[in-house]
UniProtKB/Swiss-Prot annotation:
Name of this protein: Small ribosomal subunit protein uS19
Record-linked PANTHER family: RIBOSOMAL PROTEIN S19P FAMILY MEMBER, SMALL RIBOSOMAL SUBUNIT PROTEIN US19
Purpose of the protein: Protein S19 forms a complex with S13 that binds strongly to the 16S ribosomal RNA.
Coiled coil: none
Organism: Thermococcus sibiricus (strain DSM 12597 / MM 739)
Gene Ontology BP term (one): ribosomal small subunit assembly
Record-stated family: Belongs to the universal ribosomal protein uS19 family.
GO molecular function list: rRNA binding; structural constituent of ribosome
GO cellular component, as recorded: cytosolic small ribosomal subunit
SUPFAM superfamilies in the record: Ribosomal protein S19 (SSF54570)
Keyword annotations of the record: Ribonucleoprotein, Ribosomal protein, RNA-binding, rRNA-binding
Length: 133
């Protein structure tokens, strides 16, 4: 029977990450995320964190929706369902331990994969001689 491997981020367990201050945690993050946190959180990001903390306590009942795609995923967000705007609609994102240190926007894709239809008449040389439906 295979045991689930314990999650570690840069050698620290999830419990250790939760107990860390934001300053200590930022030292573990990649440079882009570290600089983003060092500049300080925007008012929208602070509002999102406030909603997440209220939801964890059970005081915020509505689904958490955000346009703030540039928010770095912190350990206190793990386990939450956040609806992230992709430019058209809000995409549900379940925050997992493996996502710590990434941006929320990375998990709500802004572009859809192209699904081309069948080519029209005259699209290729051989299709000129195909009977029209």
């Amino acid at each position: 029977m295979a045991r689930k491997k314990e999650f570690k981020y840069r050698g620290y367990t999830f419990e250790e990450l939760i107990n860390m201050s934001l300053e200590d945690l930022s030292k573990l993050l990649p440079s882009r995320q570290r600089r983003s946190l060092k500049r300080g959180l925007t008012p929208e990001q602070k509002k999102l964190l406030r909603k997440i903390r209220l939801a964890k306590k059970g005081k915020y009942k509505k689904p958490i929706r955000t346009h703030s795609r540039d928010m770095v995923i912190l350990p206190e967000m793990v386990g939450m369902m956040i609806y992230v705007h992709n430019g058209k609609e809000f995409v549900p994102v379940q925050i997992r331990e493996e996502m710590i240190g990434h941006y929320i926007g990375e998990f709500a894709l802004t572009r859809k994969r192209v699904q081309h239809g069948s080519p029209g008449v005259g699209a290729t040389r051989s299709s000129m001689f195909v009977a029209i439906k």
